[in-house]
Amino acid sequence: MKELSSAQIRQMYLDFFKSKGHDVMKSAPLIPHDDPTLLWINSGVATMKKYFDGSVVPKNHRITSSQKSIRTNDIENVGHTARHHTLFEMLGNFSVGDYFKKEAITWAWELLTSPEWFDMDKEKLYITVYPEDKDAKKYWEEVGVDPSHIYEAEDNFWDIGEGPSGPDSEIFFDRGQEMNNLPEDDPESYPGGENERYLEIWNIVFSEFNHKPDGTYEPLPHKNIDTGMGLERVVSVFQHARTNFETDLFLPIIEKTAELSAGKKYGENAEADVSFKVIADHARAVTFAIGDGALPSNEGRGYVIRRLIRRAVMHGQKLGIDEAFLYKLVPVVGKIMESAYPEVLEQAEFIEKVIKMEEDRFNDTLKDGMQLLDSLIAETKENGGKELPGKPVFKLYDTYGFPLELTKEYANDEGLDVDEEGFNEEMEQQKARARAARSDAKSMGVQNGLLTDITTSSEYVGYHELKANGVLKDIIIDNELVDTVPADSRAQVIFDKTPFYAEMGGQVADKGVIKNQAGEVVAEVEDVQHAPNGQNMHTIHALKEMTRENTYSLEVDVAFHNKVKKNHTATHLLDQALRDVLGSHTHQAGSLVEPTYLRFDFTNLGSVTAEDLKKIEDIVNAKIWENIQVETVVTDKESAEKMGAIALFGDKYGDTVRVVKVGDYSMEFCGGTHVANTNEIGLFKIVSESGVGAGVRRIEAVTSEEAFEFLEERNQLLRQSADELKIVQIKEVPRKIEQLQEQVKLLEQQKQALEDKFASQQAGDIFKNIKDINGKTLIAGQVNVSGMSQLRQLADQWKEKQLSDVLVLATATADGKVNLITAISSDAVKEGYKAGDLIKAIAPKVGGGGGGRPDLAQAGGKKPEGIQEALKAAEDWLNK
């Protein structure tokens, strides 16, 4: 067997299948495009759904790829096993209704064993087949597999719900007994068993059945091949590595982490090795995910990124790394993957910035979590408990990123255990919720042979004309091909020629009417979508009967169409203006182009400031008023990229592409409709900017008449405001508002002064009430103040006057909450008394928790009725 690097293995796989007539498909971004059922691209086949369910017919029915993927259902196993990863690459070859079992098996064996390719030892390869799949077994024997190396397995049937399914064959590599974790005679020591000797390296799925909604199976109209070879696994075979982590995909990251650690080295300590592996795995995942547009947040993909970063940071602390470090691993990841993913190094600066910001932010979160943990420990001890309950411990893990091991360590220091069973129950409930949310995500959709088989030629002419004659070629009603559309019915129809734009790239479909040769309106066009083979398929409401092979006049609603194209060109200008103002890291995350407004989603770390929004708006309007010609160029993809055309992030393009150029300012791949000159847009106005998800912002804007109407509405609102403020000139409105704000500010200051005076009067009474408890003086009482800031002022007065050894003050706020503050004199602190310990002892009485310094601590609570009990608890604490 050859000595190959991961880059060589990846390239050799793709080159082999390219030699067999496959198109090499570039890895799609990790964020699914137009597939709301998936959180992440989680397999090679995930990008093939549209082909396998027949909704789109590929240009080449043979495809191969190395697809980056993320799976997060087993995060806790990462670092503890040899092959669990969050990010991985799946090598795959796919046949969409083309070759089937014989070719798939023959080529798999050739790639694995041919000296020209992988050159694996045939004697070390084992195959599993589905017992009823006699053809697969026959073909494996025909290519030369020893029958004793072929195993039948009942679970060799790939089925994930509705859609394509079928038997599969798994290929195992015998790494030798020295790699095994079991005795040679163990019942699990066989290909397919739970052992480390026989490593699964490839799975070939023969999709030949449709799993129907009623649970039955029927033969697929078009049989498919779907294979998956985990790159990390096969690299470990070629590089004779015991685990995936001892390969060139991970070792450089581990070595860099060791450099950053407090003298730790990989391979010296099992516990430290877990941390090294976790960090290496998570560094890869967050680097690629952020590069593909996912940003840390508290929901969806962003939550996954945040959790991975926090878990890596906590493991860094176990290695003695106390400062932000994960971001320093990004260039290492980029260098390892450079041959296949050069964009990682190109984006490295931005990715590093995002990770470092999140690492720094986690330090603050860590403090909040520690306060909650301290409160939980104090409350448990107060109630005589022996272990921390599982539910709040899981909250620490889930919300604050506290690993269970860390919580256990702190609990043990306080003489407590942790309810791990309760914790695991909470974990399982969360996983169940996640599985339920993903239940539909795996289904590929039942293959529709009818639409897939329609190959009628249909020409779109709407770029140049909005009225055209077309012959009605296909009529579909209730999923059946028919010859006539009855009056007052709905149908899907295809013409040999159409001016109607089909919804694509965020642009809505054209609307309009269809007329017969007598000029009568026979149908209204309600929607237009692309059929699997690319034809424009019109959804119509027929007013009169329509018949196949008759010629009709197709007429687009010109006013509707013109409004849409103005907004589409404005979207291109907005896209470029965003990059000009915010930076090159910003890219499109979605768009909607309607006749009345446009919506544009884009990646950005935070909200766009009002100042930047104005800059963006000014740039777009400047380009509109420059009267720039808009041109379209149809060329090959490579030439378009050399021209500098920007491709929509995540979109797939054929060999021939259409490029829309707005002078020298904007140049994008686009199949939409556009104005001939920017002056047709007239005016551009941003109406809102908001967040829609993890690191994704949304701008909504209007153009032309809608922009004028928007400004007119705002002018009316200003006029009404001026009337309410009793001023004549609209321009005086801001000044009048400033005056009112100053008056409000003055009144608030006066109110605060009165509250401070009242608080001091109360304090004077409380400060006189000094108790002697166990040799220490205590002042404890409830005051009627507005909140924590005034409690701190009273504590400062107490400190200046040195009135007692210990101070405890409480107040009930207007919203039904409690604020507590404790203070210890400097002499008492020297004797070992700590305000933080005192606050932890009394805060549970008001249903809260807190912490602080030895001389000053504070807490919040939600039980005002417990204030007197908390004050009494302070006396008990001193008595101890």
UniProtKB/Swiss-Prot annotation:
GO terms for molecular function: alanine-tRNA ligase activity; aminoacyl-tRNA deacylase activity; ATP binding; catalytic activity, acting on a protein; transferase activity; tRNA binding; zinc ion binding. Its cofactor is Zn(2+). Its EC number is 6.1.1.7. The keyword Protein biosynthesis applies. InterPro entries: aa-tRNA-synth_II/BPL/LPL, Ala-tRNA-lgiase_IIc, Ala-tRNA-ligase_IIc_anticod-bd, Ala-tRNA-synth_IIc_core, Ala-tRNA-synth_IIc_N, Ala-tRNA_ligase, Ala_tRNA_ligase_euk/bac, DHHA1_dom. One of its GO terms (cellular component) is cytosol. It comes from the Bacteria. Zn(2+) binds at H568, H572, C670, H674. Disulfide bonds: none annotated. Keywords: Aminoacyl-tRNA synthetase, ATP-binding, Cytoplasm, Ligase, Metal-binding, Nucleotide-binding, Protein biosynthesis, RNA-binding, tRNA-binding, Zinc. PANTHER family: ALANINE--TRNA LIGASE, CYTOPLASMIC, ALANYL-TRNA SYNTHETASE. Belongs to the class-II aminoacyl-tRNA synthetase family. This is Alanine--tRNA ligase. It comes from Ligilactobacillus salivarius (strain UCC118) (Lactobacillus salivarius).
